[in-house]
Curated annotation (Swiss-Prot):
Part of the 50S ribosomal subunit. The keyword RNA-binding applies. Keywords: Ribonucleoprotein, Ribosomal protein, RNA-binding, rRNA-binding, tRNA-binding. This is Large ribosomal subunit protein uL16. One of its GO terms (cellular component) is cytosolic large ribosomal subunit. Pfam families: Ribosomal_L16. Binds 23S rRNA and is also seen to make contacts with the A and possibly P site tRNAs. It comes from Ectopseudomonas mendocina (strain ymp). SUPFAM superfamilies: Ribosomal protein L16p/L10e. The lineage of its organism: Bacteria, Pseudomonadati, Pseudomonadota, Gammaproteobacteria, Pseudomonadales.
Amino acid sequence: MLQPKRTKFRKQMTGHNRGLAQRGSKVSFGEFALKSVARGRLTARQIESARRALTRHVKRGGKIWIRVFPDKPVTKKPLEVRMGKGKGGVEYWVAQIQPGKVLYEIEGVSEELAREAFALAAAKLPLATTFVKRTVM
């Protein structure tokens, strides 16, 4: 599972997930990419699950890049605990996703295979996504 090796602070405030993705919105490494068209959070488990679906479908062919990293801790208090007494412990890690963010990239496979693989990966994610190709300039 993806998570930071160490952080400056153990816990973070919830914050807001506003705006559009400025950084990480272009296909930089591969030929084809899976791009988010919705706003939300991806947990480390969801990112890994989609990665496995991608890898299994392309069967060692091509190269895959994961363009998101879960760097935000989400805390949770234990069940049946009264309110107060401080913030709960870190339960899992999430990546905050804005519309336009490239999630995964792939190269070395045909477009048809890439579309099928990304469709399988997208089924594992809680966000609406779209298939994009690299534009040569």
